[in-house]
Amino acid sequence: MIKVVFMGTPDFSVPILKQLIEDGYNIAAVVTQPDKPKGRKRELTPPPVKVEAEKHGIPVLQPTKIREKEQYEQVLAFKPDLIVTAAFGQILPKALLDAPKYGCINVHASLLPELRGGAPIHYAILQGKTKTGVTIMYMVEKLDAGDILTQVEVPITETDTVGTLHDKLSIAGAKLLSETIPQLVAGKLTPIKQDDEKATYAYNIKREQEKIDWTKPGEDIYNHIRGLHPWPVAYTTFAGNVWKVWWGEKVPAPKKAEPGTIIDIVQDGIVVATGNETAIKITELQPAGKKRMNAAQFLRGAGAHLTIGMKLGDEHES
């Protein structure tokens, strides 16, 4: 059985590692990012992939910079026949890419060359796509630009969030990898070059991208909310305070108003005007310093003073 080194870090990578184990490959080592402080107490927390690897007694390496000779040589010492990566988080050096007999392959959560980069699942929803998928390709030193080996499409539903789509793509990626490796080893795959002119990019989400722009059409704002759910979460501002908007729905606007204006307050939501006739009913939110709550809870408590005509999103962040 061929010897594999697996490189991955977040939850997305775990079903892929599990599949490799289930398929009986000799997993010589798992390479993941260093433990990081998390939560309010800033406790050092291991990456999900490390936790999974340790359950199976697989050696774990946690290089800070995989491109440094001393660090990548630790990986080469395992003499892998194949390196598989999935959301590892660092670009590999040529010495690693060239070493394995069957190369280095990556499981990427988009239909390349679309959405290269670290946040393809977010952008698929932010851009209102109705389908995305998983690509398995050879790794090169350029970001997600290697030759394509296999792909599978995954539909995006109207109610998918980053969370639900993440799980679908992770499972689809594990299944596709299970089908791809035997074909790769048997020499049955013809790599297809990516058309760089058709490449689009999904760079990691920045804080300023999380803010809701109420002047946009309601459909875009709905995609914005679900495209940042459950992380990092869309937000708006009200009276100088930040509100995280955990969920909202598209509804017909009961009347015209300046974008960001509260145009209706109902039992289960705050209806806000947008840049077109589709309003957004905020149904779940988290005011600064408070817990996440549904709109009904908010309107009974901290939001009891809200009235129609008040405006969201105009103020500078405090």
From Swiss-Prot:
Taxonomic lineage of the native organism: Bacteria, Bacillati, Bacillota, Bacilli, Bacillales
Enzyme Commission code(s) on record: 2.1.2.9
Name the UniProt record assigns to this protein: Methionyl-tRNA formyltransferase
Cysteines engaged in disulfide bonds, as pairs: none
Biological source species: Geobacillus sp. (strain WCH70)
Family, per entry: Belongs to the Fmt family.
InterPro entries for the chain: Fmt (IPR005794), Formyl_trans_C (IPR005793), Formyl_trans_C_sf (IPR037022), Formyl_transf_N (IPR002376), Formyl_transf_N_sf (IPR036477), Formyl_transferase-like_C_sf (IPR011034), GART_AS (IPR001555), Met-tRNA-FMT_C (IPR044135)
Top-level taxon of origin: Bacteria
Physiological role: Attaches a formyl group to the free amino group of methionyl-tRNA(fMet). The formyl group appears to play a dual role in the initiator identity of N-formylmethionyl-tRNA by promoting its recognition by IF2 and preventing the misappropriation of this tRNA by the elongation apparatus.
